[in-house]
Regions:
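Short, glycine/polar-rich helix-capping loops at beta-to-alpha or helix-loop-helix junctions
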Residues: 2-6, 224-229
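P-loop NTPase motor domains
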Residues: 1-13, 17-206, 213, 268-281
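Short hydrophobic alpha-helical runs that function as membrane-insertion/retention elements
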Residues: 15-18, 214-219, 237-241
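Conserved H-loop
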Residues: 186-187, 210-213, 217-224
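P-loop NTPase motor core of the ASCE superfamily
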Residues: 33-79, 225-313
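Residues in the short beta-alpha loop(s) of Rossmann-like NAD(P)-binding domains
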Residues: 134, 221, 243
Length: 313
């Protein structure tokens, strides 16, 4: 969106980081570039490379080799995911060569350059404004029904980038506790489907509670949040209109109300534009109407097609 143009009064407090596959953005999502603390960078590097390669920590043959290469990079002066490939090559064992080939095969994709650096990237993403928006262009997100084992390389890379950004958000949450912070994660269903994403989401919620921050997960279906611990830790719930009876029942169950009650089903099915089913911190459930008091904000975040927008005006 053109938020700086559509909300000129606070334009100076809006920072938009648009991550495209251009060379200037090379390595900006590399764990060793985006994370401030070396320990956090190493941990994220492990998560990303095990996610991309499918190597489990329970794999007694491959995981120790990969872990050793990552640790060696962490202890080096120049740090970046491309350096992990170099360390694996130096290892020389067939297992290390195989892992190196696997990782290297993913670096050929244009926007994969965002994830992989050789340790020479000097700039980094900073969140020094009141409203910081990180966008990644050309993401290829998997279909909701696609099994993890069937993800294409582009889909794996796309989800990996969202995991990096979400981890960066966790780092942001842990900043100054005296300042209230908000993190909004769009298309959250993509990483809620994978083990690393679920673990990260629970960390975000717990950190939000202790570090004076609100974390919003924007997802397509209530069923995307299937972790019971996570469900119990979500304080506020918003659900918009649905006509699919299965999704309606799942949503009502998520809100803790009778999913078989036809009145409840009708209430969710008949919601109008600007209305949603809402559950507050005390567990009370009801329909609320959202009134955008400031028209500037309404138009700034209006994502409808231009023709439809003009008709509504």
């Amino acid at each position: 969106g053109n938020w700086q143009e559509t909300i000129p009064d606070i334009a100076q407090e809006i920072k938009i980081v648009n991550l495209t596959s251009e060379d200037k953005n090379r390595g900006l999502l590399d764990p060793y570039v985006i994370m401030k603390r070396t320990k956090d960078a190493e941990s994220l590097a492990i998560d990303i490379l095990t996610f991309l390669t499918g190597i489990s920590s329970r794999d007694g043959e491959k995981f120790p080799v990969l872990r050793r290469a990552i640790r060696s990079v962490t202890q080096s002066k120049k740090r970046g995911l491309l350096r992990v490939i170099d360390k694996l090559r130096k290892d020389g064992s067939p297992v290390a060569e195989n892992i190196a080939d696997h990782i290297e095969s993913m670096t050929d994709y244009d926007f994969a350059h965002l994830l992989f650096s050789d340790g020479d990237v000097e700039q980094s993403i900073s969140l020094n404004r009141q409203l910081n928006i990180i966008q990644v262009a050309d993401l290829v997100l998997p279909d909701k029904d696609t099994k993890f084992e069937e993800y294409t390389t582009m889909e794996l890379l796309s989800v990996a980038m969202l995991i990096v950004i979400s981890t960066f958000a966790l780092d942001f949450i842990h900043s100054d506790r005296s300042i209230f912070k908000m993190v909004d994660l769009d298309e959250a269903w993509t990483f809620l489907q994978v083990a690393q994403g679920k673990a990260l989401s629970n960390k975000l919620i717990r950190a939000g509670r202790s570090m004076n921050a609100a974390v919003y997960f924007v997802t397509q279906n209530s069923g995307d949040v299937d972790d019971e611990k996570m469900k119990n830790n979500i304080g506020l719930k918003f659900a918009f209109r649905s006509t699919d009876i299965k999704e309606i029942k799942n949503t009502l169950e998520f809100f803790g109300v009778d999913k078989e009650d036809e009145g409840n089903q009708k209430r969710l099915r008949d919601l109008e534009n600007g209305q949603c089913l809402f559950q507050d911190l005390y567990g009370r459930v009801g329909v609320i109407q959202i009134h955008p008091v400031f028209s500037d904000l309404f138009h700034a975040f209006d994502t409808r097609p231009p023709v439809q927008t003009e008709e509504m005006r």
